[in-house]
């Protein structure tokens, strides 16, 4: 009598795959205030965007609850975002100048970055 091996899918929604989703732009968002929350709401149902992670220094940032409901990884340390999986685009809506300095190095690694005046302009469009 043949036996069937049953395997369980160990990947859960709270632990997204580190593999690249074909055709999707892999995005991380720095800042989970109003701007970051609005971006998550827009990107959440877009099949061409996969939000890899969200960072905010405040545990009380309004967007963190939304990120958790959407099964998006969250961190207080924005430097951890690039370790969460493949990243094509970083969007900085934190308003923190220190983050902008760090993102200059990220650009050199070939990752696209939207921050500063560009992020402010995008926020005004939303």
What are these model-derived regions, one by one?
Residues 25-41:
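Glycine-rich adenosine-cofactor-binding loop
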Residues 52, 86-88:
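Conserved acidic residues
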Residues 73-80, 114:
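Short acidic-hydrophobic, aromatic-tinged amphipathic segments that line or gate anion-handling sites
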Residues 46-70:
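NAD(P)-binding Rossmann-fold cofactor-contacting core
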Residues 2-24, 79:
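A short, basic/flexible loop-to-alpha-helix module at the beginning of a structural domain
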Residues 90-92:
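N-terminal Rossmann-like NAD(P) cofactor-binding module of classical short-chain dehydrogenase/reductase
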Residues 97-126:
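Rossmann-fold NAD(P)-binding glycine/threonine-rich loop
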Residues 23-26, 87:
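Phosphate-coordination loops involved in phosphoryl transfer and adenosine-cofactor binding
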